[in-house]
Amino acid sequence: NYIAYEALAGRKGAVGVYNYETGEVLCMVSTPAFDPLNPPSAEELEENDAYEGAYLNRFLSGTFTPGSVYKTVTLAAAIENVPDLYDRTWTCTGSTTVGDGAVTCPYAHGEQDIYAALSNSCNGVFALLADELGEDVLARYTEKAGLTASYSVNGIRTAAGSFDLDGLTANELGWAGVGQYNDLVNPCALMVYMG
């Protein structure tokens, strides 16, 4: 726990490590935090922003935007629903039009197949795939991945993830397919999914 706490270096966040074979949680850290043997006064808690959320266990109760990890959900859906996926190539210029707007990448990846798109974490390719797959398919794979589930950790229920994909525009669905837009996932659920 100490190494995880130090790695967070005062930033707000959570770290969890578990044995994927047994489900045993080996490490669970949430910051900000304080020494329970020397707690801050009520006045310090109120006046010092460093303690904001100190009573919240972000690993259990928090939800966060998953970011590019969610591309693995979009990829799983595409593998099973896009028959010519492995024969396609895309050209990333750093900005891809999806619906009525742009989905941007920090780099222009050039021409790439699905392997390169995953390796490069190309927002444009995964946004196009998300749009092609549609709301229902992405919602089904998100649920299959367990990202909307609440898990029990020693009898304490985690927050459930939230992926409201109904009625999105093509551009919004594209951003959701790369783990942005209004996607929210609990760190424990993400840990279980990736394990």
Regions found by a protein language model. Give the residues of each.
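Beta-lactam-recognizing serine transpeptidase/beta-lactamase-like catalytic domain environment
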Residues: Y20-S68, V73-G195
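Conserved, well-ordered alpha-helix/loop/beta-strand core segments that scaffold catalytic motifs
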Residues: N1-A14
